[in-house]
Design a protein with these regions (language model features):
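Transmembrane beta-strands of outer-membrane beta-barrel pores
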Residues: 50-56, 68-70, 77-81, 86-92, ...
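Repeated loop/turn-to-beta-strand initiation elements of outer-membrane beta-barrel proteins
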Residues: 42, 79-84, 112-115, 160-164, ...
Length: 390
């Protein structure tokens, strides 16, 4: 059964100074050391989050409760660097779902080139996130956005305006504390309890991305465009091996404090399934559901930052719209729209999001929403988040 969605542990950690590194305490981070030295600098940051939700498609608790927490470690030195991120979420009890999101180390080949090894986000799309919202676009649930896998990534800066990534990922990021193989952070292929259902494992993922800053002389407008491609093997338990071929093009237009981001792409997965050739089982955040194997997708996002909106308060309104248009005749298109705003003051943030979904697995839908669709029509969610950043 599809379980309710957890908006993306926090355990309190005591860090002692190591090898006489000096400590610098800032308003939002803790850091030790100097990144310009061989020993390097360690930075600790994160947040703790509570939420309140109101849904028109189910009985809401209408209670403010702990939702999630994040702990991040960042290491930077003259030659080496690294990153670790750990999160915990509450479904029924504190941290009943927790996961390692990133854990990697890197080496700086030169000022313009570096290589990263370990669990990390894949260089697919304009960045890790394609929208400004906390809830995320439905491409997150489809397994195309905010994907974290185990592999190696080479990044090269070509001149002042061009960035290139070439990466290889041997397997998915796996699950940790939670409901078995449905407990990864990123959406990946999983197996249903039905023994007759194909078991799909994605391996040997090759990903490439190029991003180009377009120089616009004497203009306050900044334009970045690019594209990415993803090819992988899909090993089926029936002994056959299929492939995924996915791509997208993207662009970001910036004018002063305003940003417009557009993404358009295509996902083609041939799982070699003898029972369900048109969709596969995906799992994340302790939920299992179906995703169409072949679809086009579109994500649009706009945000505007207003500094000192009121005294020391900063305000960022934003909006996003996602379309997952499946190829299979009779499969209904999935959409998600989000209108939101975030208010920040010092280390505290308040975010409010009004979300409308149709054929949306986590907004009033069911396990088949991202495949054939559902009969729920438009469903709505009000999501309020209270965040303490450190």
């Amino acid at each position: 059964m599809l379980q309710r969605f957890l908006v993306k542990p926090f355990s309190f950690c005591t860090l002692s100074s190591v090898m006489a590194m000096s400590a610098a305490v800032q308003a939002d981070t803790l850091s030790w050391g100097d990144a310009e030295t061989d020993l390097g600098k360690l930075t600790v940051s994160g947040w703790v989050r509570a939420n309140y939700q109101d849904k028109d498609y189910s009985d809401s608790d209408h209670k403010l409760k702990f939702n999630a927490a994040k702990l991040s470690l960042k290491y930077d030195a003259k030659t080496f660097f690294g990153n670790a991120e750990y999160r915990c979420y509450q479904n029924d009890t504190l941290c009943d779902f927790s996961t390692l999101v990133n854990a990697n180390l890197g080496y700086k080949l030169s000022d313009d080139s570096r290589i990263t090894v370990g669990l990390q986000d894949m260089p697919f799309g304009i960045g890790r996130f394609w929208s400004s919202s906390w809830y995320g676009s439905s491409m997150d649930n489809a397994g195309l956005e905010d994907v974290h896998n185990l592999g190696i990534n080479w990044q090269q800066q070509l001149g002042d305006n061009t960035s290139l990534n070439l990466a290889y990922f041997v397997r998915d990021g796996g699950g940790f504390v939670g409901d078995g193989d449905a407990a990864p952070y990123a959406a990946n292929y999983v197996k249903l309890e039905d023994a007759t259902t194909d078991d799909i494992e994605e391996k040997n993922m090759w990903v490439a991305r190029i991003s180009q800053q377009i120089p616009l002389q004497d203009s306050p407008v900044k334009l970045n465009v690019g594209g990415s491609y993803w090819h992988s093997d899909l090993e089926n338990s029936n002994g056959q091996t299929g492939h995924r071929n996915a791509w997208n093009i993207f662009g970001r237009l910036n004018y002063q404090k305003a940003n417009l981001t557009l993404t358009a792409g295509q996902n083609r997965a041939d799982t070699k399934s003898l029972s369900n050739a048109d969709y596969a089982t995906v799992g994340s955040f302790e939920s299992k559901y179906f995703v169409a194997n072949k679809a086009n997708y579109y994500v649009a996002n706009v945000d505007y930052q207003i500094n000192d909106f009121y005294k020391n308060y900063d305000l960022t309104p934003y909006a996003s719209y996602t379309v997952f248009d499946k190829d299979k005749s009779g499969f209904a298109t999935s959409t998600r729209s989000i209108l939101g705003a975030q208010l920040d003051v010092q280390q505290f943030s308040l975010a409010a999001e009004y979300i409308t979904g149709k054929n949306d697995v986590f907004i009033g839908g069911d396990a088949g929403s991202l495949a054939g669709g559902d009969t729920s029509g438009h469903s709505r969610l009000l999501n309020l988040l209270f965040i303490y950043n450190f």
